Curated annotation (Swiss-Prot):
Belongs to the HflD family. SUPFAM superfamilies: YcfC-like. The keyword Protein transport does not apply. It is a peripheral membrane protein. It comes from the Bacteria. This is High frequency lysogenization protein HflD homolog.
Amino acid sequence: MAKDFRDITLALAGICQASRLVQQIAYQGNADEKDVEVMVNSIFNINPTSTLDVYSNQISHLKLGFQTIKAIHQAVRREKLTFELMTYQQGLINLERIINKNNDYSSHLSQKISQLERQKNYFEPLSDGLFNALAGVYSDAVSPVGPKIQVNGSIELLKNPIIQAKVRGLLLTGLRSAVLWRQVGGRRFDFLLHQKTILRQTDDFLAQC
């Protein structure tokens, strides 16, 4: 069956957007709330009608993700921030593979997300309480299963418990997109083997943002 690179690129943009937001929070302590909200909402969209529906049916909601795909491709590999983004992206894809291959891991994560979905109305959107809850899911159901994603940033910021919670919460949103990436046919080496196709599709999406 032929790969649908439209859907694959959308899911990859979700992974990259989450990775970039993690980086922004870790270095700056803040990020665009609309970009963050799109990613947080994606976790609770358990039964989407399409790939784009995961991101509220708006291509523009993934603009940062498309820009990040381009940045990763265009930058020199030795550039520190770009290397970090590549590390986060691949780390999320690898973690998802480990979880997907183990029924206990995947069931535990699904249960935690379902439980949080039932409780989400008790939290204000993007509140510290919500991020603490998201971080709790990540720490309980994701961190123990495989190699930890080492996040770089401001040492002082990363000592802050709410910054830590936001980083873990956003990594969880990236894992949601990594699940989607696999479901639509994405594979670990697609960005290398089908780079031109993905970049062309990325340019098409950016033109619509």
